Amino acid sequence: MAHSTGGTVKTDEVNFFFRNEHGQISKMLKPAQNKSEMEGGKPVAVVYATGSSARNSGSASGIGNVGRMGAFSQMGSQGQFIRLQDNGLSIPKTEAGTTYTTVSAQKTSGAGSGHYDLPLKGDRYVKFTPNPIKMKSKLHAIQSNSLHSMSASSSSVQRKRKPDKAGKGLRHFSMKVCEKVEEKGKTTYNEVADDLVSEEMKNNAYDNNCDQKNIRRRVYDALNVLMAINVISKDKKEIRWIGLPANSTETFLALEEENCQRRERIKQKNEMLREMIMQHVAFKGLVERNKRNESQGVVPSPNASIQLPFIIVNTHKSTKINCSVTNDKSEYIFKFDKTFEMHDDIEVLKRMGFLLGLDKGECTPENIERVKSWVPPNLAKYVEAYGTGKTGENMYESDDEDNEFNGYLESANESQGFAQHSAQHTTDGEFKLEMDDDELDDDID
């Protein structure tokens, strides 16, 4: 601002506005000197601060350390002040009975030159000596409030988020689909989708058409994912529940236990198969011998033949035996005063040698081929293994596991059926056990 040293000087108080280090605008009443200067051929009143320099902000007057003040023009005898936009700016009281005022924004003219018009009427001004520490904390609070109000206003302008619709993500619907399919066991896509649509529409009522399409699409995607990880299976339109994958340790223990159980069952079935093959071979050997004897004209007497099946009781000659029979002859009760042995017909046939050494693993190659002709073709390898004594686990291994397993079942069923068939017909007397007198004496005392 241009000013001259000449002119009238008058000491008075004037309103000073300054901007602090935080960018806030404040005003205060300060002793000043008024000088009349000539500018553009017209007298202009120029105000200068007393006790502080108008050109620096680091004075010791207590104002410079808060903000920078400057020289401002006065037009007439009335005190003028700067009008700036700073709503809600206030200055605290410093003396008893003093007041403060709020400065509102007004349009000014000549802001670049420092000349201001339109005096503000009816305002009361504060006369105080500012405390730098209190002023700094107060200005910090004002700035914080200003920033908070700015952020609040900006957030209010932002677009409001709509609440979550029923169309949620794939993870959500995968869980829902899992629960539905597990609950039903067997279901279809339409049934699962209809149930989920009704549930979601009941909880969330928005755009029904849009949400239904979204839910059905999510259900379709979830079913494909679950089918890919083998949780469910799909056969045409029918969806079946398989189950969620379990923990690897639990799965390993369960498989290990199942493996042991199956191996034990296989072992038992192998023993059953071996016993059935032995019975089959013994019966075939008996039939062949009877045919050979009949062809030679040897016909046993009724006392020398025993009908199958039978049980032989073996004990000492001095043993006292008490035998009682029920009226329907379905039960026989024996009482012995000494030890005794009981043998069924199969055991007797084994002792008579009709197995040709097959049970002991001492069968000759000729007898092995002979026995193979008595059994079904799929059991021939078992006969060879029993005859040679090679009855390890390797005999049950095969390149074609499915065919081997099926052959195993068929052989077991055929052998069991043959045993039942033989037992049924031997009761009618079709098969006869012919024993020599020497053999009877050896087995029955």
From Swiss-Prot:
Residues where Phosphoserine is found: S398
Pfam families: DP (PF08781), E2F_TDP (PF02319)
GO BP, sorted A to Z: dorsal/ventral axis specification, ovarian follicular epithelium; eggshell chorion gene amplification; endomitotic cell cycle; intrinsic apoptotic signaling pathway in response to DNA damage; nurse cell apoptotic process; oogenesis; positive regulation of gene expression; positive regulation of nurse cell apoptotic process
Biased composition (Basic residues): 158-168
Keywords of this entry: Activator, DNA-binding, Nucleus, Phosphoprotein, Repressor, Transcription, Transcription regulation
The keyword Kinase is annotated on this UniProt entry: no
Matches recorded under Gene3D superfamilies: Transcription factor DP, Winged helix-like DNA-binding domain superfamily/Winged helix DNA-binding domain
Subunit structure of this chain's protein: Heterodimer of E2f and Dp. Cooperate to give sequence-specific DNA binding and optimal trans-activation. Component of the DREAM complex at least composed of Myb, Caf1-55, mip40, mip120, mip130, E2f2, Dp, Rbf, Rbf2, lin-52, HDAC1/Rpd3 and l(3)mbt.
Protein name as catalogued: Transcription factor Dp
Annotated source species: Drosophila melanogaster (Fruit fly)
Taxonomic path: Eukaryota, Metazoa, Ecdysozoa, Arthropoda, Hexapoda
